[in-house]
């Protein structure tokens, strides 16, 4: 009989811990859902909260059409298999010694996808690089940009001043910052941040980023097909 309390006490403690954990997790998800719903209302997108195999709510997601473009806001942990084809295209663009689509290999991340036709198959990526040149603009000192073959011709128009400002806003005095990648690959512009969407400030930044990415996609789609011969060799997903 003396051993019964020794068994019940740890079990009760574990049960209490699990209750607290799931309540807090549920509260965090509800907070995220509210932020996603605010973005959904702003851009007339559909908000959803998929469930995992165990029946628990996972990441909230947004999807729909905005400015005649398919737009998605999603999240993942470590990697999202839905990005697999874009990861392959990114490896072609960056090369064997270049960065990967996700520089931070572990932890949560949130990303925006804005679809585009990209008739000339332009491709580029923007990556944080604090070892940039001493001269030049502030953007040049903090970020490294690489274009596919011939992409530099229109790069200045695609990576608009609004996009540059938003990326600079993610840079702080701290080494840790949310920005991971901005890239054009095949049929989509992708913006990736480390972590989950947790604050109204983040939601506002994502809202500005969606509009800026749509502006950039308009430029990409206005690029005529005759430039295909000097554009990136990176191809769109089937």
Which ranges hold each PLM region?
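Transmembrane-cytosolic junction motif
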Residues: 16-39
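Canonical hydrophobic alpha-helical transmembrane segment
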Residues: 12-14
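Charged, low-complexity intrinsically disordered regions
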Residues: 33-82, 86, 93-238
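Feature marks short, highly hydrophobic, charge-poor N-terminal signal-anchor/signal peptide-like helices
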Residues: 1-10
